[in-house]
Curated annotation (Swiss-Prot):
Belongs to the YajC family. InterPro entries: Preprotein_translocase_YajC. The gene is yajC. Keywords: Cell membrane, Membrane, Protein transport, Translocation, Transmembrane, Transmembrane helix, Transport. The keyword Membrane applies. It is found in: Cell membrane. Part of the SecDF-YidC-YajC translocase complex. The SecDF-YidC-YajC translocase forms a supercomplex with SecYEG, called the holo-translocon (HTL). It comes from the Bacteria. The keyword Transmembrane helix applies. One of its GO terms (cellular component) is plasma membrane. This is Sec translocon accessory complex subunit YajC. One of its GO terms (biological process) is protein transport. The chain crosses the membrane at residues 1-21. Pfam families: YajC.
Length: 114
């Protein structure tokens, strides 16, 4: 009798774990679907490969992304990871100047090692 109670308790715990895991997965999937359905020309996006671009044309399964002025490439919608929100425009306000970066050669010279 005691082993039956333990088995039922174990099954109940496993069932609860599976329920909450699938619920979280469904919520994540719905957020991704909502993102793909809301893409519009002019949106700034990140791709899964880390590229930042501007959407030019939205098709059924593809998007045309402008990755540099006048350079447009076609990508699958599935390659879009997320939309760049206006709050993410920190770098637009604080553009880097060429002297702001330290290059590897400068690091080696400052350490005294060559």
């Amino acid at each position: 009798m005691e082993s039956l109670v333990l088995l039922l308790l174990f099954l109940l715990i496993m069932g609860g774990f599976m329920f909450f895991a699938s619920r979280r997965q469904r919520r994540s999937m719905q957020a991704t679907i909502d993102l793909y359905n809301s893409l519009q020309p002019g949106d700034r996006v990140n791709t899964t490969s880390g590229l930042q671009a501007t959407i030019i044309v939205v098709g059924d399964d593809t998007v045309d992304l402008e990755i540099a002025p006048g350079v447009v490439t076609t990508w699958m919608k599935l390659a879009i990871r997320d939309r760049i929100l206006p709050d993410d425009a920190y770098m637009d306000e604080h553009e880097a100047e060429p002297g702001d970066f330290v290059y590897c050669d400068e690091l080696e010279e400052s350490d005294g090692s060559s």
